[in-house]
Swiss-Prot record:
Protein name (database record): Methionine--tRNA ligase
Chain ranges for the short sequence motif 'HIGH' region as given in the UniProt record: 15-25
UniProt KW Zinc keyword: yes
Protein function: Is required not only for elongation of protein synthesis but also for the initiation of all mRNA translation through initiator tRNA(fMet) aminoacylation.
Gene Ontology MF terms in the entry: ATP binding; metal ion binding; methionine-tRNA ligase activity; tRNA binding
UniProt cofactor(s): Zn(2+)
Locus of motif 'KMSKS' region: 332-336
Length: 680
């Protein structure tokens, strides 16, 4: 942090209180923000970490209508769940409040009124979709229809979730109201707009000239918006849920959620510090950092700064370290499709393993490009890195100390050249980790911390103190002293990343606290200092545990496919005479068995009313042979025989229907008929 700043205000994007938090939110915003804040606190710097729930906006009203409850019921439920999940996961907010609070309503209204009185808004009349049955204007998300790009049904008025294209309500083909299902009409409505074009000049200089250090994805997106030319943006909308526009003639209108939500950072600070909140938002010696996902870049880098500048008394953000998106098993995370790993469910399924997820999400952090989370990678990083590297080194160092020195830190004797080389390797770790954290490279910083554990593992493997114990206990003492100093350094280096493990390790080391300035020192544990009992820092995660999570996702995928199933188009019309050429008959299955060395095939002996025939069918993955014996099936009797590589000849084709998920269902009859009966 630059010397000109005395304190840092850190904000993290306010999650919508219309559903739980998932790993995409964590990887994109909350884990990196928490790492950074914990790092600053360890350095004894003055920092404030502000969070809260975004409780206004259309997604909340849509869920409320769907569930037949009020929007307040929705936000009360999810605010509590989100807040408790964050707390259990170790996201260390100084305050986690909400935008339905009295403080927020007052401050957001006051903010709008200040800009209104200063003439910072323009009034515009526009045409907007209106639901005549529900008697209300329709927000973007209240309009659905066919996407003009990929032609998927159910695209929203602001975006198609199938192809990801941003849309306007008027882009949709055959639009309909999500409230009544009726076709909406266009009606005139008046709103207030923030003229971003008026702010384009100073925004261009402030971002493109003064903040070239911002991440390329952030800088690039801002440049793209500025190069296209900024347009006025509505700050109000026709809705009955939100903060009422505080001026005359604004009945039935509320503050647009993008205007309302970022003010929540300020109101939450005011709620926490009613007497000193302005120091954290208006003092030029305060540094403001926004942690967000890439879908919020324009709001935090262009729109919110324009709001703050227009108000006139607030500082502007110094950095906006936005991440890209995290995908799940190769597919985009989607709340509506339930394609996510939900934080509250993870905490239930993996009790005491908060740090494993924190570690994996940081190791796979989408800092400059979209990245992917897979359960197999989660397991591998836990077992091969946390357990086999970090945990293994800590355990060996402590267990050997208890075995040979009754758990007391042994005396460090004369150092060998190898000892000195090892100590030199981790002497610079503080500077390396600091350099990376200061520029928000959390993935590389965590990797640097793990390298410290690798150094320790290699040191013990090379020096083999368990072998020297028979001949040279002085040498063993020196080796274990060095190993323990490395362990203590790991407790500090990993504190911002893995706070639960660092706390557990400090207890094992019998140390209440460490400070960041101590990182890299080789005398953190005094000779003779008594250690506590050694415990495993991490546990191996077994295959069946991971398979249970994979199966849960597969079940979700099948449910989504079933819900979105659309039959294939009908094939070209054929003449009746063409159909008559097919001889479709009923046969009774006399025998059925799997074809040896061809596990997908079943061999049937079919009674067709004239003789018995052999038919081979590729349905072995869908039926057990015994399930089909005695059943009647439909088959094409006049299909040319087909010979397989093993010499087997199939004399027909059994008819099956293919379900949406690829499973096959053999066609059958409602009542039994004579074998050989024709299908007409």
């Amino acid at each position: 942090m630059e010397n000109k700043f005395k304190r840092t205000t850190v904000t993290s994007a306010l999650p919508y209180a219309n559903g739980p938090v998932h790993i995409g939110h964590l990887a994109g915003v909350y884990v990196p923000a928490d790492i950074y804040v914990r790092y600053l606190r360890l350095k004894k710097e003055d920092v404030l970490f502000i969070g809260g729930s975004d409780e206004h906006g259309v997604p909340i009203t849509i869920r409320a209508k769907k569930e037949g409850i009020t929007p307040q019921d929705v936000v009360d439920r999810y605010h509590t769940l989100i807040k408790e999940s964050f707390k259990e996961f170790g996201i260390s907010f100084d305050i986690y409040s909400r935008t339905t609070s009295k403080t927020h309503h007052e401050l957001a209204s006051e903010f709008f009124k200040t800009l209104y009185d200063k003439g910072e808004f323009i009034e515009k009349t526009s045409m907007q979709y209106y639901d005549e049955e529900a008697h209300q204007f329709l927000a973007d998300r209240y309009i659905t229809g066919e996407c003009p790009h990929c032609h998927a049904e159910g695209a929203y008025g602001d975006q198609c979730e199938k192809c990801g294209t941003s849309l306007s309500p008027t882009d949709l083909i055959n639009p309909k109201s999500a409230i009544s299902g009726s076709k909406p009409v266009m009606r005139e409505t008046k709103h207030w707009y923030l003229p971003l074009d008026k702010h384009e000049g100073w925004l261009r200089e402030w971002i493109l000239e003064n903040h070239k250090e911002w991440r390329p994805n952030v800088y690039g997106q801002c440049k793209s918006w500025l190069d296209m030319g900024l347009q006025p943006r509505a700050v109000s909308r026709d809705l009955d849920w939100g903060i009422p526009v505080p001026v005359e003639g604004a009945e039935g209108k509320v503050l647009y959620v993008w205007f309302d939500a970022p003010i929540g950072y300020i109101s939450n600070t005011k709620e926490l510090l009613p007497d000193s909140w302005e120091t954290w938002w208006k003092d030029p010696e305060t540094r403001l950092i926004h942690f967000i996902g890439k879908d919020n870049i324009v709001f935090h880098c262009i729109v919110f700064p324009a709001m703050l500048k227009a108000e006139g008394s607030y500082i502007l953000p110094d950095n906006v370290p936005s991440n890209e998106f995290l995908n799940l098993e190769g597919d985009k995370i989607s709340t509506s499709r339930n394609w996510a790993v939900w934080l509250h469910e993870y905490l239930q399924d993996f009790p005491g393993k908060q740090d494993v997820l924190r570690y994996v999400l940081t190791a796979n952090a989408p800092e400059t490009k979209d990245n992917d989370f897979t359960w197999k990678d989660f397991q591998a990083r836990n077992n091969n890195e946390l357990v086999a590297v970090y945990g293994n080194f800590v355990n060996r160092a402590l267990v050997l100390t208890h075995k040979y020195f009754d758990g007391k830190v042994p005396v460090c004797g004369e150092l060998t050249d190898y000892d000195k080389e090892t100590l030199k390797e981790f002497a610079d770790v503080k500077a390396e980790v600091e350099k990376l954290l200061d520029v928000f490279k959390f993935r590389d910083a965590q990797k640097e911390a793990m390298n410290l554990a690798r150094i320790g593992n290699k040191y013990l493997a090379d020096t083999e103190p368990w072998k020297l114990a028979k001949t040279d206990m002085d040498r063993v003492a020196t080796i274990l002293n060095i190993a323990l100093q490395l362990v203590a350094n790991l407790a500090i280096a990993f504190e911002p990343f893995l706070p639960f493990s660092s706390e557990k390790l400090r207890k094992m080391l019998n140390m209440e606290t460490f400070e960041w300035d101590q990182l890299g020192r080789t005398d953190l544990l005094a000779e003779g200092h008594q250690l506590n009992k050694a415990e495993l820092l991490f546990e191996k995660i077994e295959d069946e545990t991971i398979q249970a999570q994979v199966d849960k996702l597969l079940a979700t995928k099948k449910a989504n496919e079933a819900a979105n199933y659309k039959a294939n188009p009908i094939k070209p019309v054929i003449a009746f005479e063409e159909f008559e050429k097919l001889d479709i008959r009923v046969g009774t299955v006399l025998e059925c068995e799997v074809v040896p060395k061809m596990k997908k095939l079943l061999k049937f002996k079919i009674a067709d009313g004239l003789e018995n025939r052999t038919i081979v069918s590729g349905i072995a993955q869908h039926y057990k042979p015994e399930e089909l014996v005695g059943k009647q099936v439909l088959f094409i009797a006049n299909l040319a025989p087909r010979q397989f590589k093993n010499g087997l000849v199939s004399e027909g084709m059994i008819l099956s229907a293919e379900n949406f998920d690829g499973t096959l269902a053999v066609t059958s009859l409602l009542r039994e008929v004579k074998p050989g009966s024709e299908v007409k």
